[in-house]
């Protein structure tokens, strides 16, 4: 079996990133401020932040299960000033978990109010 690594038609395009959350309201408030985007759809168990004109959007999905383990995937956000971005995210309800510098890149590992991990990244 061989794998074609050349350019071809994609299976699909990235439309949304979905995060499972327990507290939908606090996460909506946090992520709309962090991303600087408004909600484009909201229902009992879902809220979409951003729209079709600026993909990918972030879809928050309310689930009953608690966040107990490290995320297998996470969001990276590029920032101009890491310290300012960390302070702002913490002020909005986030938590700083770690700060790492490797290969000329520094990033802060963060968690949203529901424990979902993401990184604020400054490229040197």
Model-predicted regions and their roles:
Residues 1-29, 55, 73-75, 121-124:
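N-terminal beta-strand motif that seeds the catalytic metal site of vicinal oxygen chelate
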Residues 13, 69-71, 102:
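Residue-level preference for beta-strand/loop junctions
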Residues 23-24, 75-114:
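Vicinal oxygen chelate
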Residues 34-39, 92-96:
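Conserved acetyl-CoA-binding loop of GNAT-fold acetyltransferases
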Residues 37-71, 113, 117-123:
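Conserved short beta-strand elements that form part of the metal-binding/catalytic scaffold
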